């Protein structure tokens, strides 16, 4: 039995049912942290005088790493490149992570929580870190638009299903 207060194994504060069984599915964020943050302001101070509206290129990626049977690290990578015809205004790259605990869940539900729900929970905090980094670099804070992680997740599942179906011989399900 986990010791009281062990956040990596004791995911719920409620004691198990009267028979001692712990069968309720549970998932949650145990810890959040900045794993890596890079800010480049390569053309300062000249870039502060540029009047042209910069073009923004925002990329994101989600990865997961299993720590143990109940805990995974979810990494949300966000890269922001701001450019004008005169050159790069700034570049911000962030790896924002969360330790996620999941217990008594099917693999399908764990996968959905890992790649849709956990990033949705982490994103507002990552967005704040990026906004603060851009502001601290001397520019107006950048407020990234919300991302529909669930919609993207469902779209990718559908694409994978279509690819699997396209590769199957006729007459097979």
Over which residues does each language-model region extend?
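N-terminal intrinsically disordered, cationic/polar leader segments
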Residues: 2-121, 125-173
């Amino acid at each position: 039995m986990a010791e009281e207060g062990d956040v990596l194994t004791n995911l719920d504060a409620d004691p198990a049912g009267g028979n001692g069984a712990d069968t309720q599915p549970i998932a949650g964020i145990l810890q959040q942290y900045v794993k890596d943050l890079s800010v480049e302001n390569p053309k300062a101070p000249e870039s502060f005088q540029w009047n042209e509206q910069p073009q923004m290129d925002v990329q994101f990626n989600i990865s997961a790493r299993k720590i143990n049977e109940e805990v995974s690290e979810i990494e949300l990578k966000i890269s922001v490149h701001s450019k004008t015809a005169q050159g790069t205004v700034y570049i911000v790259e962030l790896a924002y992570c969360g330790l996620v605990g999941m217990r008594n869940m099917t693999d399908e539900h764990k996968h959905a929580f890992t790649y849709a729900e956990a990033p949705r929970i982490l994103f507002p905090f990552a967005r704040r870190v990026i906004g603060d980094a851009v502001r601290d670099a001397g520019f107006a804070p950048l407020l990234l638009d919300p991302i529909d992680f669930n919609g993207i997740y469902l779209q990718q599942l559908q694409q994978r299903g279509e690819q699997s179906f396209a590769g199957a011989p006729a007459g097979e399900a």
